C-alpha cells in the first residue's frame, strides 16, 4: 500500500497542512493554558484586600487571622503566578482556606484545581455553575449552540465542596462574603460583596462577575437557556442596589487596575484611587445599554448569523 502520494505538489501540500496543524495546536494549547497572561506585581488594594492576579485575568486575596480567601483561579497556566504573588506579599498558599469562583469559564476557573491541591482549600461554586466547574468547564449552558466546544476546551477539574444559592454567606474567621448571583454571562455568574476596613474607614467591595454579553447568546425565543433575558435584567438591578465603594472585576481592564495602581503613588491614601462608586455605576449603565441594543437587534433579526455579525 502506497502511503506517500506520487505527485510532488500533493506531498508538499500534506507537509504544509501537517506543519500548520502542529503550529495551530501549539497555539491553541498555549491560549487555553494561560491566554498570553503575564505576571503582574501584587499589591494591597485596601485593608486586608490584595491583588494577586495576572496582567488582565484577575485574582484577589482577602487575608485574616484564621485563614485567607482567594477569589478566582485564572487560567491553568496562571495558577503558579497567583501562588508566587501570594508568597511575594508574605502570605502562604497553605493559609488559603476558601477558594471562590466568579464563573465557570476556563480563564477564571482553569487554575482552581492546582490552587486547591496546593492549599487544601474548600471550593465554593454557585449551583448554576457547579456542574460545569466540576466537569472542567464542559457543558456550560450559557454557551448555547456552541456548548459542544466546551467539551474540547477543558481545564483540570477541581473538587467542588460547596454549592450555594443567591445570598449565601461564606465565612473564614472575621471575613464574611456575600454571594450575589448575577447570571447572564453564565447561569451561575456570582458577584461577591464584602466589607474591608482601611484605617478608620469601612468600605464595601463588590467583585463583578462579568457583564459581557457573549455574541452567541440568544435573548429571544429560543433563549440560550430558559430565563437568560430575565437573568440579565435582574443582574443589572441587583448590582445597582449594592452600595459599592470599591469595585473589582474578572478582567483588570474592566475596572482600570493599571490606571488606579499608578495613581496610588501620588494619592493621599493608596486605597483612594480604587474608591470609585461613579465608575461602578457607569460600568453597569454601559453594559445594560449594550444589552438593550442587542435585545432590540435580536427582536428585529433573531437569526444566529445576525448575532454572530454583531458580535464580531
Tell where the protein language model's regions lie, with residue ranges.
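Short, flexible loop segments at the rims of nucleotide/cofactor-binding pockets, characterized by
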Residues: 47-51, 74, 99-102, 223-228
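Conserved beta-strand hairpin/beta-sheet module of binuclear metal-dependent hydrolase folds
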Residues: 36-89, 93, 191-213
Amino acid at each position: 500500500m502506497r502511503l506517500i502520494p506520487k505527485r510532488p505538489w500533493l506531498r508538499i501540500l500534506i507537509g504544509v497542512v501537517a506543519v500548520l496543524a502542529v503550529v495551530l495546536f501549539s497555539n491553541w494549547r498555549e491560549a487555553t493554558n494561560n491566554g498570553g497572561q503575564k505576571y503582574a506585581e501584587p499589591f494591597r488594594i485596601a485593608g486586608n484586600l490584595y491583588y494577586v492576579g495576572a496582567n488582565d485575568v484577575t485574582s484577589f486575596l482577602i487575608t485574616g487571622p484564621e485563614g485567607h480567601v482567594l477569589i478566582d483561579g485564572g487560567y491553568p497556566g496562571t495558577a503558579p503566578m497567583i501562588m508566587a504573588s501570594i508568597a511575594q506579599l508574605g502570605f502562604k498558599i497553605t493559609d488559603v482556606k476558601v477558594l471562590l469562583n466568579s464563573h465557570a469559564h476556563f480563564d477564571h476557573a482553569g487554575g482552581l484545581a492546582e490552587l486547591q491541591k496546593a492549599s487544601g482549600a474548600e471550593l465554593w461554586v454557585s449551583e448554576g455553575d457547579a456542574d460545569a466547574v466540576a466537569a472542567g468547564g464542559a457543558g456550560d449552558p450559557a454557551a448555547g449552540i456552541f456548548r459542544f466546544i466546551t467539551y474540547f476546551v477543558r481545564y483540570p477539574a477541581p473538587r467542588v465542596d460547596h454549592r450555594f444559592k443567591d445570598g449565601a454567606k461564606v465565612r473564614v474567621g472575621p471575613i464574611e462574603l456575600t454571594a450575589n448571583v448575577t447570571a447572564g454571562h453564565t447561569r451561575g455568574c456570582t458577584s461577591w460583596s464584602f466589607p474591608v476596613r482601611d484605617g478608620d474607614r469601612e468600605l464595601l467591595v463588590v467583585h463583578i462577575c462579568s457583564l459581557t454579553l457573549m455574541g452567541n447568546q440568544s435573548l429571544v425565543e429560543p433563549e440560550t437557556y430558559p430565563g437568560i433575558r430575565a437573568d440579565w435584567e435582574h443582574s443589572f438591578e441587583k448590582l445597582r442596589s449594592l452600595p459599592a465603594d470599591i469595585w473589582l472585576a474578572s478582567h483588570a481592564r474592566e475596572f482600570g487596575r493599571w490606571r488606579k495602581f499608578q495613581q496610588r503613588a501620588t494619592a493621599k491614601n493608596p486605597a483612594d484611587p480604587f474608591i470609585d462608586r461613579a465608575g461602578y455605576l457607569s460600568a453597569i449603565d454601559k453594559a445594560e445599554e449594550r444589552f438593550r441594543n442587542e435585545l432590540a437587534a435580536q427582536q428585529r433579526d433573531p437569526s444566529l448569523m445576525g448575532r454572530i455579525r454583531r458580535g464580531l
